[in-house]
């Protein structure tokens, strides 16, 4: 078309099955580009999608179209001119919401464009009718009010102007008649398409009711199966609990058997020990006698130690006494030595005097 897209997104394209009017048929193998365009030549808005070289959507938006969200990621609209229903599957709910909002905006713009076109057509039609009514009256007025001389002087230019106006009116009337015929055909096509779409919608409604009944049956069956699954899971839980109890009992039995084997081993050891008890008793008596003898020897040694301690104390006492006596003797000796020195000095002095 040579126009830039107003809005572009990507989606999986589907069309309703023309035979059953119930099932969706994929129009694209993968997500393709879906765009809104404004057709300047026809003053209309279109939704166009191309998969490679194949045009899979070329839908003209009209004010009576409605885009319906049927799930979180799927929406559809009916195209009466194409006699089909388009469906789009998006990768996210956000993309679906944006597409639906843009559809509403474009539908409002299409309504405004249609109203303007209708006003232009009505204005053109009214102008043609007024021109057709005014032409005879003006001719009549000129013939009544004018004189023979005036008729002669103005006949040439007036006829030329009237012919030109008549030619324009003929062309306008021809175009209007052609447009009216075209609109009648388009209106009849729209009525037939609306009738087919109404039938398809009624069949779809019946199919929806049937799907609802089937869904209700499936839901009841699903609930029954879920309850059965819950019962089986409960039974499995009980079986697992019993298995766990059995495992615990087996483990306890193994532990008790191990303890029993240990007790039997201890009993054997005790029996072996009981066989050597008499020998141990005799050895114990022998050791007791040795212990008593050692205790007696120890007692004797302790007595000797106490005696030696007494002797040591007495020896220390005598040493202290001897030290005192020795000290007194030394003091006396020192005094005697001092006296002897004094006596020598006296003798020396006497010898000197003689």
Curated annotation (Swiss-Prot):
Where along the chain is composition biased (Polar residues)? Answer: 123-146
Which domain of life, per UniProt?
Eukaryota
Q: Which Pfam families match?
A: WH1 (PF00568)
**CDD domains for the chain:** EVH1_Homer_Vesl
Annotated ranges, domain WH1: 1-110
Alphabetical UniProt keywords? Cell membrane, Cell projection, Coiled coil, Cytoplasm, Deafness, Disease variant, Hearing, Membrane, Non-syndromic deafness, Synapse
Any one GO MF term held by the record is:
actin binding
Domain note for this entry? The WH1 domain interacts with the PPXXF motif in GRM1, GRM5, RYR1, RYR2, ITPR1, SHANK 1 and SHANK3.
On assembly, the entry states: Forms coiled-coil structures that mediate homo- and heteromultimerization. Interacts with NFATC2; interaction is reduced by AKT activation. Interacts with NFATC1 and NFATC4. Interacts with DAGLA (via PPXXF motif); this interaction is required for the cell membrane localization of DAGLA.
Family assignment? Belongs to the Homer family.
Q: Which disease is it linked to?
A: Deafness, autosomal dominant, 68: A form of non-syndromic sensorineural hearing loss with postlingual onset. Sensorineural deafness results from damage to the neural receptors of the inner ear, the nerve pathways to the brain, or the area of the brain that receives sound information.
Record-given protein name: Homer protein homolog 2
Q: Which organism is it from?
A: Homo sapiens
> Taxonomic lineage of this organism?
Eukaryota, Metazoa, Chordata, Craniata, Vertebrata
């Amino acid at each position: 078309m040579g126009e830039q897209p107003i809005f572009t997104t990507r989606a999986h394209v589907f069309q309703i099955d023309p035979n059953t009017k119930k099932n969706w048929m994929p129009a694209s193998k993968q997500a393709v580009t879906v765009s809104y365009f404004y057709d300047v030549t026809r003053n209309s808005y279109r939704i166009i999608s191309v998969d490679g070289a194949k045009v899979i959507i070329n839908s003209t938006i009209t004010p009576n179209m409605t885009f319906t969200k049927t799930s979180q990621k799927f929406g559809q609209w009916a195209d009466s001119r194409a006699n089909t229903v388009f469906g789009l599957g998006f990768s996210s709910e956000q993309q679906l919401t944006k597409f639906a909002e843009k559809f509403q905006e474009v539908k409002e713009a299409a309504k405004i464009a249609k109203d303007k076109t209708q006003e232009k057509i009505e204005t053109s039609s009214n102008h043609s009718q007024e021109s057709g009514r005014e032409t005879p009256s003006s001719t009549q007025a000129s013939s009544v009010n004018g004189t023979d001389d005036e008729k002669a002087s103005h006949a040439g230019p007036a006829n030329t102007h009237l012919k030109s106006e008549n030619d324009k009116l003929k062309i306008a009337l021809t175009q209007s008649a052609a447009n009216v015929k075209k609109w009648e055909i388009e209106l009849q096509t729209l009525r037939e398409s609306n009738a087919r779409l109404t039938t398809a919608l009624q069949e779809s409604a019946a199919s929806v009711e049937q799907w609802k009944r089937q869904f209700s049956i499936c839901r009841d069956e699903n609930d029954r199966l879920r309850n059965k699954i819950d019962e089986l899971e409960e039974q499995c839980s009980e079986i697992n609990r019993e298995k766990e109890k059995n495992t615990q009992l087996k483990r306890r039995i193994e532990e008790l058997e191990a303890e029993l084997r240990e007790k039997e081993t201890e009993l054997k050891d005790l029996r072996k020990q009981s066989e050597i008890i008499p020998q141990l008793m005799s050895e114990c008596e022998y050791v007791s006698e040795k212990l008593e003898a050692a205790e007696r020897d120890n007692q004797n040694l302790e007595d000797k130690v106490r005696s030696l301690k007494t002797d040591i104390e007495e020896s220390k006492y005598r040493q202290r006494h001897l030290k005192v006596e020795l000290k007194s003797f030394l003091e006396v000796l020192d005094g005697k030595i001092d006296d002897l020195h004094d006596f020598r000095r006296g003798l020396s002095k006497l010898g000197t005097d003689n």
